[in-house]
Amino acid sequence: MPESDLEELPGVGPATAEKLRDNGFDAFQSLAVANSAELSNTADIGESTAADVIQAAREAADVGGFETGATVLERREQIGKLTWNIPEVDDLLGGGVETQSITEVYGEFGAGKSQVTHQLAVNVQLPTEYGGLHGRAVFIDSEDTFRPERIDDMVRGLSDETLQAAMEAHEIEGSTDDEDTLTELVDAFLDKIHVAKGFNSNHQMLLAEKAKEIASEHEDGDWPVRMLTVDSLTAHFRAEYVGRGELADRQQKLNKHLHDLEKVGNLYNAAVLVTNQVQSNPDAFFGDPTKPIGGNILGHKSTFRMYLRKSKNDKRIVKLVDAPNLADGEAVMRVQDEGLKPE
């Protein structure tokens, strides 16, 4: 939407509109999903005025009312599926990682969580006919896990046919056998991954707002943001809020953070991928005692929950633990130098 539209809302003059735009509220859709307290603080207006602005934005953007199931089905046809390039895992997910949803991948150290985030940051840039979304990725790195060298490995590890398609998508001419051409292609992939290191939970939450700005900036471009990754979602929250006395505060902040991530996914048709740490449940006498951090809040906010665990050598077991429309199941993949590969 044009920025000038904001001034058409009741209670929004030029000065207020400028404050809203400076804080990432540059379209009716972003205002429509805000809450009145957040908007009141951002624009320095009363909460009742903020509520009126939000309601007007919802009406203008046609957001927040009831819809028929047929309308919801039609809208869901716009949702993209991002491939893992592992048929077993893609089948498990009904075609791949969904846009407009939060997918949580949890597992112990070394299970391959960060490998998944790197591989999907590559795959999202592939043409849609090769399982990609022809989009860029935003990567919030809270554990210093992002390695451009790993992106290099994974791009070079694509099949020749996929490499050729990627070269066409990135408008690079040459042969897949030519080293200079491959280097140029790797650089093109890296240029479309926006990385920021989160130093603490507050900074991590701020970066989610910055991610929204990046998505807005590229919304109408040739390479829109189609994936937002947080690796790891819970590390800072777990370290900073210790003990039962601080659990409520931690969960409240985590809920706000997840809500912000969810908004980016919904507004910009992006897949939201978060990794999560685990802990052992000493009360579990049977089965796997490993459970994810984050409690019920993360459990409810994650549309898809996936559990990675180590197997022999480079094998990893990928288990779909929870999904609204899919049966639980398991698949096997390999973590190799060239990236994630089928068994």
From Swiss-Prot:
Pfam families registered for this protein in UniProt: HHH_5, Rad51
UniProt keyword terms in alphabetical order: ATP-binding, DNA damage, DNA recombination, DNA-binding, Nucleotide-binding
MF term (GO), any: ATP binding
Binding site for ATP: 107-114
GO biological process assignments: DNA recombination; DNA repair
SUPFAM superfamilies, per the entry: P-loop containing nucleoside triphosphate hydrolases (SSF52540), Rad51 N-terminal domain-like (SSF47794)
Functional note: Involved in DNA repair and in homologous recombination. Binds and assemble on single-stranded DNA to form a nucleoprotein filament. Hydrolyzes ATP in a ssDNA-dependent manner and promotes DNA strand exchange between homologous DNA molecules.
Family listed: Belongs to the eukaryotic RecA-like protein family.
Protein name as it appears in the record: DNA repair and recombination protein RadA
